[in-house]
């Protein structure tokens, strides 16, 4: 609770300095990362709603970040309706072309309430994986983009699940040394040229990477 409120307060103060900035309220997986949440709908909606209430006073829109199933996305959207704010959806694909739930990106189009949808991103994915899925996310016909990571892999492994609260994910998943700000920006420019309008970094990206993104033409 403290961290959610504190982050909101800091973001809100920063917005006073930069009025054109929009503050996103991140709503990440409420259970395991990179795994579909198979708990009951009541449990999931309660978790999303509880976090959304904490950050709602500080944010302009909500961002569902690194979700691994369409069910989670639908429940998440339902959980924030009372706040009447737009939202961005960030889906995760560890490897290949399917969400951890086994669903495809194209399955989203018939399952999303798009009335306040700002767009869809592939979230916490490698540049190479975004490239594989670029055409399919583009074919959704809505604003799209990415949050690129710098991990060697994000495919779940048993010890990652077991130690998720006690181990550093960077140690378990490995960190790439080749994705310098310059290299990451080259990927981002390529995706921007292909139509991506939502550009961002996730795990193992640094302020220097984001600065490089901000300078793209």
Where would I find each of the regions flagged by the language model?
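Domain-level signal for soluble alpha/beta catalytic cores
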Residues: 1-217
């Amino acid at each position: 609770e403290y961290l959610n409120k504190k982050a909101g307060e800091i973001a809100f103060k920063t917005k006073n300095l930069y009025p054109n900035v929009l503050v996103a309220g991140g709503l990440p997986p409420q259970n395991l990362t990179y795994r579909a949440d198979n708990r009951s709908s009541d449990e999931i909606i309660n978790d999303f709603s509880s976090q959304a209430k904490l950050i709602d006073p500080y944010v302009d829109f909500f961002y569902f970040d690194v979700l691994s199933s369409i069910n989670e996305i639908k429940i998440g959207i339902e959980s924030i309706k009372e706040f009447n704010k737009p939202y961005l959806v960030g889906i995760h694909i560890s490897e290949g072309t399917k969400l951890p739930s086994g669903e495809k990106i194209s399955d989203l189009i018939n399952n999303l309430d798009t009335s306040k949808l700002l767009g869809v991103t592939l979230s916490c994915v490698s540049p190479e994986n975004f490239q594989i899925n670029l055409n399919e996310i583009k074919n959704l016909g809505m604003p799209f983009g990415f949050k690129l990571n710098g991990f060697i892999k994000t495919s779940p492994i048993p010890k990652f699940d077991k130690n998720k609260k006690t181990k550093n994910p960077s140690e378990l998943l490995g960190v790439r040394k080749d994705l310098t700000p310059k290299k990451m920006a080259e990927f981002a420019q390529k995706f921007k040229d292909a139509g991506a309008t939502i550009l961002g970094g996730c795990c193992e990206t640094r302020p220097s990477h984001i600065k490089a993104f901000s300078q793209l033409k």
